[in-house]
């Protein structure tokens, strides 16, 4: 083990002996956008073409331990002989241009401050070490994307883990940021080490807007059936997938319900990066059933392309 990595693990072990804290100190409030809807209504809407112009953007290349991305104790992973290793992954941001409501992004991409990721002041030294931050290779900044789109009217997060909020610093203060319920309040000992970083990455966000999922776990975001938020808890309590009905067909952005291509193709949930592994497996199975029911859907896992 590298000496610095050993130090980090000692610090983390010490943190685990302490009371936990929330993921962030940023305030939350119930989102006013969207309406609760039954699952069957979403299924029926998929049959019609959608008005949204969709584009998937590669924000950065990266590499992190496979054991965080994938449950290596799953029988399929064991049978495949998968071992922990540094796994090449990508950070994506998705742009949604709605002809009536404006330009939105799913997740936030990479801020200009990460062009020299190893020296980014928002990320603490311990988090840089733990998450291989110096290995980030930015391909597109959120500032560049915002100029290309002519502005960004809102951000729909799949969850508030660091790698999904790294682009918010390029947006103007006051741009609304939407996330699932419970992510901000989630208590964990590891947040002792990560909360400062999360707060700094959310510095332009005065209040997080939390989706108000009902019993169906489905929200019709714009009220016109063009974009659906799907509660997919497990990786985090508020993890949310988004189904966009677009000019290029239905697009399902699943966040980190599974990070990798192998995970999606084999139905294996994330590993140590998930808050609740069994719940992750349930949510992943639900999203896979949706994709089987509607084979026209293009699926986008969190950090690798299919």
Report the location of each language-model feature:
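Active-site neighborhood of phospho(di)ester-bond hydrolases with catalytic His/Asp-centered motifs
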Residues: 105-107, 154-159, 179-180, 231-234, ...
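Divalent-metal (often Zn2+) His-rich catalytic cores of metallo-beta-lactamase-fold enzymes
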Residues: 220-223, 244, 250-251, 261-262, ...
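Core dinuclear metal-dependent hydrolase active-site scaffold
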Residues: 56-57, 81, 86-88, 93-98, ...
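Metallo-beta-lactamase
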Residues: 21-151, 180-231, 249-255, 275-295, 297
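Active-site metal-binding motif and surrounding structural segment of the metallo-beta-lactamase
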Residues: 119-178
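Bacterial N-terminal signal peptides that target proteins for export
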Residues: 1-10
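Bacterial N-terminal signal peptides
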Residues: 9-19
């Amino acid at each position: 083990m590298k000496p610095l990595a050993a130090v980090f693990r000692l610090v983390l072990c010490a943190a685990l002996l302490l009371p936990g804290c929330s993921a962030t100190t940023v305030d939350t409030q119930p989102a006013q956008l969207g309406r609760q809807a039954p699952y069957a209504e979403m299924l029926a809407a998929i049959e019609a073409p959608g008005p949204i112009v969709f584009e998937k953007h590669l924000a950065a290349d990266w590499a992190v331990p496979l054991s965080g991305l994938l449950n290596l104790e799953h029988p399929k992973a064991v049978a495949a002989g998968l071992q922990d290793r540094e796994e090449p992954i990508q950070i994506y941001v998705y742009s949604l241009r709605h002809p009536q409501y404006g330009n939105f992004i799913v997740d936030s991409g990479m801020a200009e401050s990460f062009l020299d990721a190893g020296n980014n002041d928002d990320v603490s030294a311990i988090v840089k070490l733990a998450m291989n931050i110096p290995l980030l290779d930015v391909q597109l900044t959120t500032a560049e994307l915002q100029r290309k789109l002519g502005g960004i009217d809102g951000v729909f997060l799949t969850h508030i883990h660091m790698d999904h909020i790294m682009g918010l610093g390029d947006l103007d203060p006051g741009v609304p940021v939407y996330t699932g319920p419970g992510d901000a309040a989630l208590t964990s000992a590891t947040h002792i080490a990560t909360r400062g970083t999360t707060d700094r990455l959310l510095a332009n966000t005065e209040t997080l807007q939390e989706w108000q999922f009902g019993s169906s776990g489905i929200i019709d975001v714009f009220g016109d059936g063009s974009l659906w938020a799907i509660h997919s808890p497990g990786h985090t309590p508020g993890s949310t997938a988004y189904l966009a009905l677009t000019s290029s067909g239905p697009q399902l952005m699943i966040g980190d319900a599974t990070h990798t291509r192998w995970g999606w193709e084999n139905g294996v949930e994330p590993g140590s990066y998930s808050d609740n592994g069994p719940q992750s497996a349930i949510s992943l199975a639900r999203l896979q059933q949706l994709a089987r029911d509607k084979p026209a859907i293009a699926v986008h896992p969190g950090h690798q392309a299919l």
